[in-house]
Amino acid sequence: MRLSVVGRLRTIAFACVIAVLVAGCAHQGAGEKATVQRMYVFNCGESVTNDVSRWSPGVNPGQPWTFSNNCYLIRHAKGWMLWDSGLSDGIAAMPDGLVALGGALRMKMPRTLVSQLAEAGVKTTDVSYVAFSHFHPDHAGNANLFTAATLYIQETEYDAIFGPTPQKFGFIPAGYEKLRTNPVVKLKGDHDVFGDGSVIIVSTPGHTPGHQSLLVRLQRTGVVILSGDLTHFQANWDARRVPGMNFNRDQTIASMEKVAALVVTEKAQFWINHDQAQSAKMPRPPAYLD
């Protein structure tokens, strides 16, 4: 029986709808399954304070504390991505470290980032993508080594680091000045870096104007969320405490709740960058996570 023109159009339209739905489902499925190939965790410094209450106001005044500091090298099919660059490699040449905050903090770099990249068989020029949780010097201390990489940064953070008063936010321009000429992707919120759901930048403002965290999907390890300085150690996270050195308290609390919900929905591990006890359990090069 021959279909009428209207009937044929309806059939074609229905087929198109099915095709769109199938394509959408296929894309969603690919996004759910996509993972990075591996991720290295580097020791990018440590900082010792004589008073941890600077980071947990009113709690444990006068108690000494050691903060870990990690960088993460991610291997994706499209290339290498570095998340945070830690303290400056120059500190590794200082036997007594570098003193900051009027003597309240001593920063040390046991190994250079460059030497740890080499253990993974990677040079700084091999890194195609770079992103920082924020631009305080313990996270962006080696930023100038990655001038060939595409920079992923929240627009609010970009405006702050290259604006007229970067020191107001605790930024030190000399540590990242060379990034001015990098190819840059300015973000206004969450962003799927590779378009497949394997690496997602999560906007978490508060600690700085454009602070961000990172969700990484690994085949065996599962989903990991890298905190940046959303929180500094487990007890602060559990109590939702905000350090005194912080840009916007309300934004930080809101960002904490956002990530806490994401941890639940993604069944994710939450890795707190400066939590020494947690960091001590992480594999180091040449070992990696996959």
Describe the residue ranges of each PLM region:
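Metallo-beta-lactamase
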Residues: 18-20, 24-126, 154-203, 221-228, 251-267, ...
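Bacterial N-terminal signal peptides that target proteins for export
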Residues: 1-13
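Active-site metal-binding motif and surrounding structural segment of the metallo-beta-lactamase
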Residues: 93-153
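Cap/insert and terminal regions of metallo-dependent hydrolase folds
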Residues: 89, 101-115, 213-215, 220-290
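Short Gly/Pro-enriched turn/cap motifs at secondary-structure boundaries
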Residues: 61-65, 202-207
